[in-house]
Design a protein with these regions (language model features):
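Aromatic-anchored, charged helix-turn/loop surface patch used as a conserved interaction hotspot
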Residues: 62, 68-100
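Long, amphipathic alpha-helical surface segments
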Residues: 1-21, 29, 37-40, 74, ...
Length: 214
């Protein structure tokens, strides 16, 4: 997808969220984190779990399908609406987690809930405990412990791109899929999980968006 199209979509989602849910103070960089991991598709496709999906990884619900049967058009405006609603729902759920203490972790919790669902996220017990310690004291050591716990999961082996982008956000404070040499620089002598090392030391071309994303 071209940069201009990407910016237009992110801008539209940001505007909708900031207009309808200004109290959440969801930034464009948070929306970009979701977008950079998920990509965007203007057409319906079937995801790896068999769900009909469109836009920013929006899985069609029974209600969505009923509305489509009644004539709902899958134009850009509708896809932006779904994306905004999905992001807001996940961020709201992120803030209800007992391990949530500061907004520094909100995009990470939010995206994981967006991707895994509330129940799926609840299974990441050790990661959530490590995230709590990281929020209480944002040191490199605590950051590594948190990322190692996230890396120690089947999810991390399936979506190394997501692990890489989240790691960049935690360690750099920026949303990017770039090469992450800081992991080795910061944590020499530390035990880096193989999944985390694999995700952060791959060349960027390895992490191209799936072909169905346009």
């Amino acid at each position: 997808m071209g940069i201009d199209k990407r910016r237009l979509i992110i801008s539209a989602i940001t505007k909708r969220i900031q207009t309808h849910w200004p109290e959440l103070k969801i930034s464009g960089s948070t929306i970009y984190l979701y977008y950079l991991i998920e990509g965007w598709s203007d057409i319906l496709y079937t995801d790896t779990t068999g769900n009909q999906t469109i836009g920013l990884g929006h899985k069609l619900t029974a209600e969505d399908k009923l509305r489509l049967e009644k004539g709902l058009q899958l134009g850009r405006e509708q896809l932006v609406c779904w994306a905004a609603n999905d992001i807001v729902k996940s961020i709201n759920l992120a803030e209800t987690q007992p391990e949530y203490k500061s907004k520094v972790i909100r995009p990470v919790f939010g995206y994981l809930i967006f991707n895994l669902g509330h129940y799926g996220f609840s299974k990441f017990v050790k990661f959530r405990a490590a995230a709590l310690k990281f929020q209480e004291m944002t040191t490199d050591v605590n950051a590594l412990k948190m990322l190692n716990e996230l890396a120690d999961s089947k999810w991390a082996t399936q979506v190394p791109r997501a692990l890489r982008i989240i790691s960049n956000y935690v360690l750099r404070g920026e949303v990017t899929a770039n090469y992450l040499d800081e992991v080795d620089y910061h944590f020499k002598g530390e035990n880096i999980h193989p999944n985390l090392r694999e995700a952060t030391f791959r060349e960027p071309s390895y992490f191209n968006l799936p072909e169905h994303h346009s």
